[in-house]
A protein has these predicted regions:
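Class I S-adenosyl-L-methionine
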Residues: 62-63, 68, 80-217
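Conserved SAM-binding motif I beta-strand of class I
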Residues: 26-31
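Conserved SAM-binding loop of SAM-dependent methyltransferases across substrates and taxa
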Residues: 11-24
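Conserved class I S-adenosyl-L-methionine
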Residues: 1-10
Length: 217
């Protein structure tokens, strides 16, 4: 357990759970909105964790002390917003473990991470309320690396052997097939866009087929 920051903590359930389980020694729980932050304070107080969890009104990581921080969690928002939050403190994130859970725009976030000196260490997928999401573990290395279309789309999620990862990949395939259908039906078709969607859908089918084969062995 280390010292973490939960950005956009909402009701404060996550930092409370992390401290109670011993996964974190202490947490800084932040939110940009006073209402949710009041709820988080109440949750912390009801669990008797005021000594280990500090709550603070903040926009992303702006104005927060990052010295001694081991982990930063940014979950439950769009990939573009997560990238914007990180972009304002990039050079101070060396040695910090990032756990990022984009609700939307995951490909954008992966592209941004690769292009701004972050390495994606691993991904784990989760299904909640019938929707599948990826949780991205990343770290700042300073080395910018290429992010081809397939990697932007799936990241390291195929390495996750859990059932939720299969659901996540099937969701991505469904979206690509829907996108391809729309592109083909367009009054002014985009050949490059169609070719890319066809390629991504084919790759996703291959990944899913390989997973099924491995399961059957």
């Amino acid at each position: 357990g280390g010292r973490g920051i939960d950005v956009g903590t909402d009701h404060g359930y996550l930092p409370v759970a992390l401290v109670q389980s011993g996964a974190a020694l202490s947490m800084l729980a932040t939110d940009v909105r006073p209402g949710p932050l009041d709820s988080a304070r109440r949750c912390v107080r009801e669990n008797g964790l005021e000594g280990q969890i500090e709550t603070r009104l903040a926009d992303g990581l702006d104005g927060l002390p990052l010295g001694g921080i081991t982990d930063i969690i940014i979950a439950g928002m769009g990939g573009q917003l997560i990238a914007e939050i990180l972009s304002r403190r990039v050079l101070e994130l060396g040695g910090v473990n990032l756990l990022l859970q984009p609700m939307t725009q995951a490909p954008y976030l992966r592209q941004w991470l690769c292009g701004n000196g972050f390495a994606i260490r691993q991904e784990r997928c989760a299904v909640a309320a019938g929707k599948a999401y990826a949780v991205i573990q990343a770290a700042f290395t300073g080395e910018k690396i290429p992010c081809p279309p397939l990697y932007a789309l799936v990241g390291r999620s195929p390495e996750d052997e859990g059932e939720d990862a299969g659901t996540y990949l099937e969701t991505l395939l469904g979206r690509e097939e829907k996108r391809l259908k729309g592109l083909c039906a367009s009054a002014s078709p985009n050949p490059a866009g169609i070719a890319e969607a066809e390629m991504l859908a084919a790759w996703l089918r291959e990944i899913l087929a390989a997973r099924d084969q491995k399961k059957g062995e």
